[in-house]
Amino acid sequence: MIKLVSAGPFGLLAFVFITLILALPAPRATAAPVVTKPKTSAAVTVTDHGDFWTLDNGIVKATIGKNSGALWSLVYHGVETMGGGGYWEQTPEGAPQLTNSVTINPASNGGARAEVAVKGVTGGKFMLTPSAPGGGTYCDIEVRYAMGRDDSGIYAYAIFSHPTNYGAMGIGESRYITKLDHAFDWISVDADRNMLECTPQDWGNGIVIHAKEQRILSTGNYKNSVEHKYSYTAVQYKVPAFGWSSTKDHIGIWFVNPTIEYLSGGASKQELVCHFDANDDPDPIILDYWRGTHFGGGAQCSIAAGENWSKVIGPIFVYVNSLSSFKSPGKTDLATLAATAGNPTVPAAWKENATALWQDALRQAKVEQARWPYDWVNGVDYPHKDQRGTVTGRLVLDDLQAKTTKLPHLTVGLAHVDYTNSFSGRGGFRGGGTNGFGGGRGGFGRGGGGTNGFAGGRDGFGFGGGTNGFGGGTNGFGGRGGFGFGGGSRVVDWAHDAKFYEFWTDGKENGKFTIPNVRPGTYTLHAFADGVLGEFAATNITVAAGQSLDLGKLDWKPVRYGKQVWEIGFPDRTADKFYKGDGANYWLWGWPVRYGDLFTNDITYTIGKSDYHKDWFFEQVPHALSDAWKNPAAKDPLNQRFGWMKTGTPDEDMWETIGRGRATTWTIKFNMARASKGQATLRVALAGADGYGGLAISVNGHGVGIIRPTATEALRYNTDKGVWHEYTQAFDAALLKKGGNEMQLTVPAGELTSGVVYDYLRLELDENYKPDGTHVANSGL
């Protein structure tokens, strides 16, 4: 067929090409959906068209641009899956030296596999990728695409390299992304975000509220709801396959990560994975962040001058599947969908079809995990299986106050030893943009500016900018208190690292674990589990190529500051055990708006009587002052998932009316058998927080301190977790009296998306504490 394909964001090139492939057989209605099994033994071919290649195996046909390494087209049995196409945040395009090559020639292996590569060599000069929020880099970048016989998709990977003759540099936000055809209308992230999406037209008609990525929908199935791209974030470790499918064409397209070793932030890193683009006619998109900056996890990737560094990102498998037979909704189902617009009842047939495609993608993820590391990746720093090691051991909990010695949902990983990032110092504070690159979050561009210099922004090259230099900012080049060039040094731990590889696994309840396929090196072993407050760590774990290393019994003795008096919830690094923190609810936009009506008198929680599942809200935020958000047509505006929000008007941001609240005080009541002495310690584990004046703590009317947590954007981005932190507040135990006691936690007045997201609270008492004790009040762990 004749197909016009544009280069989209990768350039102005457009080309027409003719594909001669077998059409996908028309699917048929059936009692249960059935996934299509690939039926071909066609050899893989690679064809050079001058400005682009095509890779074809009779199932998929991929078109790759030879300047940018962009995926211009991915045709599956005659059906185009791409809209804007696929690309890396930083690309080789624009490098002083650009080469492209066929790195695996199918003519040499009987058509078993083909691979093409585009490499940009900067020569140590800065290479700016146009329009990339993550900015540019000094690194050499090589982008590769590979396809095997019978592969229902294509593998994409990138190699970032910094030779010893290059200067100091950092890498901003970085990811691989595909922008899809608008036929994809069903999003699948996890069991709770496996759903029909609004249409691109509905998004385009929506009214912005609070931020450009949030819109109140005024039309369609989800009218009177807020669509927000951050509603579809996920912990990357827990979603090995995610993507979109089409309710009409019965095709799915997915990103499959066979491992997270090349991703930042380890086994608890939350990132964007699927959502709509932000413009008025958006493509559905899939993203794979390897250097993510969201939710307080501004991962660090700063390389010193003269440092020899490289990292292989991927291969990621872009998997495409379809249904050979499917379930069809009845007329009654479609009528019900139309009648319930706003808070829709979606046809069960659509969900069964989409779930079948998603579950098949998850099965494919297990296949890819078993194949990892791929034996066909060569010529880069990528050890094969026999060049890697395996680490085993058994963690044993040593805690006399623990209810059990079991370690449910044990997660164990190996990460680079904590290190101080490469650069420190203080950058300038000029804004502007005179002869300089802009600023903004994530890197070059979007505001800021420095005279003759590269400006800044969060997570990129710094806030503000500097004269003739790299500007200032958080996590970037320069600025007060930042993390990168000129930004003030900081210790980088596993939860904030993107520079090195990490290796994580699920352990067993009895503490046993096996970590396979570890690159040779020296690591720190980390572990956390449900029910255990804190984290285990063991240093100097050296892994050799081909070695099986048994660490034996590892005693895990969690920190205690005294005898436990009471607890609320249990530690698991999420808010899912608290009211509305469960998977069906937490990700929905607007719980800070609705909190004040759910708990009109705020919260009073009585230890031993209250139930944290329903009596403790998962986030403590200011108490809203306005009900102007309520849709009068909503049946249950406080609890229904969709359709509860007034639309508002395009010329007014409703957030200006509803977005602030008064101070919120929660009270915890508890009894003591007798008056106390020594030191008491409140331990607060936070799954997330957003910038505000702190969490003020009082005991029986006496203020004892303020916890000032690290901002993780968990509230602004409506999630139940950011980077996890524990905070402690010690106080004189003499404040505790025999009989009834009250502790109050207060969030100050302010914007509704300021406050905390709770994981767990515990009060401990050490009656033998001496003033010269080592416990430091209000310390963050």
Where are these regions (language model features)?
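Beta-strand-rich N-terminal accessory domains
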Residues: A32-Q90
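Extended, loop-rich substrate-binding clefts of extracytoplasmic carbohydrate-active enzymes
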Residues: T47, Q90-P163
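A contiguous, surface-exposed recognition patch within enzymatic or periplasmic domains that forms
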Residues: K179-W309
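A short, amphipathic beta-strand motif
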Residues: G389-D399, G511-F513, L554
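Short, acidic Ser/Thr/Gly-rich low-complexity loop/linker segments typical of extracellular
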Residues: T420-G428, G432, G484-K512
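A short, solvent-exposed beta-strand micro-motif common in secreted/extracellular proteins
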Residues: G511, G521-V532
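Structured interaction patches on ligand/partner-binding surfaces of diverse proteins
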Residues: D530-K553, K557-V559
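Beta-strand-rich ligand-recognition modules
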Residues: E652-D653, I658-K677, A685-G780
